Amino acid sequence: DTRHKIDDVTEEYWNERMNVNLRHYFFTVQSVKKSMIENKGGVIVNIGSSSWMVGQGGMAAYTAAKSGVVGLTRSFARDLGEFNIRVNSVVPGWVLTQRQIDLWLNEESEKDLMKNQCLKERLLPHELAQAVLFFSSEQSGGCTNQSYIVDKGWL
């Protein structure tokens, strides 16, 4: 999620951001589809971002790609449901990985984050992983075509 100004985005940068944040979802599904059909089902869990839902500025290429993840999730769910393949996405808020902390977290940004979240604590990577594990399990057998927000109540 490299920050960038609109005027600084080149076609090369745009394509690279789409490759990193969107393209692989499509081609991964394309490559596993046949074996999932042969196995009479499966589960696909994509990872989106809530940044486009909140209108995050300063990273238009990233937010465009991540909104595309939701579109792909919904299309894949429709196309693959007849083969008993469930497709969902988990849409995290600001997950405070070490990279996020090092690059962008400061006293002001954390104060603003806590002001906007219902749960006044940091969203950590393992919490996102728990949602992915749920959607990967039989406990979510009735869930497909959904994008589940994990953001401590930010949205």
Regions found by a protein language model. Name each.
Residues 5-6, 10-15, 113:
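Substrate-binding pocket helix/loop in short-chain dehydrogenase/reductase
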Residues 26-29, 41, 122-150:
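C-terminal substrate-recognition "lid" of short-chain dehydrogenase/reductases
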Residues 29, 65, 73:
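Active-site helix of classical SDR
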Residues 9, 55-63, 75:
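Active-site loop-to-helix junction immediately N-terminal to the catalytic Tyr of the SDR YXXXK motif
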Residues 49:
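Residue(s) in the substrate-gating loop at a strand-loop-helix junction
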Residues 91-102, 155:
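Short, flexible catalytic-loop segment of classical short-chain dehydrogenase/reductase
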Residues 34, 78-82, 141:
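Alpha-helical segment proximal to the catalytic Tyr-Lys
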